[in-house]
Amino acid sequence: MKKNLRIVSAAAAALLAVAPIAATAMPVNAATTINADSAINANTNAKYDVDVTPSISAIAAVAKSDTMPAIPGSLTGSISASYNGKSYTANLPKDSGNATITDSNNNTVKPAELEADKAYTVTVPDVSFNFGSENAGKEITIGSANPNVTFTEKTGDQPASTVKVTLDQDGVAKLSSVQIKNVYAIDTTYNSNVNFYDVTTGATVTTGAVSIDADNQGQLNITSVVAAINSKYFAAQYDKKQLTNVTFDTETAVKDALKAQKIEVSSVGYFKAPHTFTVNVKATSNKNGKSATLPVTVTVPNVADPVVPSQSKTIMHNAYFYDKDAKRVGTDKVTRYNTVTVAMNTTKLANGISYYEVIENGKATGKYINADNIDGTKRTLKHNAYVYKTSKKRANKVVLKKGTEVTTYGGSYKFKNGQRYYKIGANTEKTYVKVANFE
């Protein structure tokens, strides 16, 4: 039986809203304890076993004006722990006295005094992870996917991106602190949106495109892609007739795009270039937290666009399109006796049925057609059968004998006489056999 994971916190809470279990009342000075599943399995990130990601929200203080009273700053947030493919979260209390906020000069700052557009470091002390006594003595590594998050195992240690700890006799891993750097206090009075602009024209853009040639080995370097994007686009907020630049991490965006396409990158940043790929560049304002994303299409002209092998097939029964989950896509269909370009082989989807993927202009479309509407299904007659043209007329004088294997196409048709028939014969002729003859 698995144990629910709870997060309890000294810097965190008098009352913690913990998912997926009910809220748990704790004394204000309780240490942060995370109760995890009983079996420790490695995180998908091989660098650490438990992924801890704090999320901190800071609001800047607003000075008194003629139109509004002074508003103090505030700090709220949560700590999430990802373990064994599941995520669990505990909320930090507003303006927790146990959490320490420091500015760039390492001066301690009260939540009420937070200023906009300044980077702060938030330190949450006494964090523990409870994996149960059955894991006592095991060694685990704790880390975070967020590069701004660091940990200290003991008081006086230098913060590190990962820490290796040995569980005590109760299966508990104890940390001296969790630190979150680059926390920006949001100015709630500043309403300007973030937009991307073309460097040359100054025009606002919602999509982008760059072209880069690969080297003679068909490779690109991440730095080349980053430079191409950064030289063509910038992000900014417009206010009081002026633009204020908003920074964005293009390198991480490029790496994420390559990872999504399962393209390997060498230790020095080289990768085998595809003909085209899309980089989603996100810019977030440190002043008011607003953001914008610019999808940039990167084209590599001297790398051939790969063509998916395909074949032409005749549809023998009206066919709808389906997605990879075997769910119908829209109402469009390919009518019988028309041809369609499909992949060379069928694919078995989630429902266990074989489908052909539709190919258009040498590209896989992600749309599928039931293979039964193209290749048919072989069935054995249980009775002698005539071949019909209509419900009343036979197509010919042929009598199909019991035990004969016949290929039928698609689902059955209901004729005017109320009986159901299968289409047989890989042709455009009206040739049908009663379904009852196969039962």
Curated annotation (Swiss-Prot):
Keywords: Cell wall, Glycoprotein, S-layer, Secreted, Signal. GO terms for molecular function: structural constituent of cell wall. Its main location: secreted. One of its GO terms (cellular component) is S-layer. Pfam families: SlpA (PF03217), SlpA_D2 (PF22797), SlpA_N (PF22796). It is found in: Secreted, Cell wall, S-layer. Glycosylated. The keyword Secreted applies. Residues 1-30 form the signal peptide. The S-layer is a paracrystalline mono-layered assembly of proteins which coat the surface of bacteria. This is S-layer protein. It comes from Lactobacillus helveticus (Lactobacillus suntoryeus).
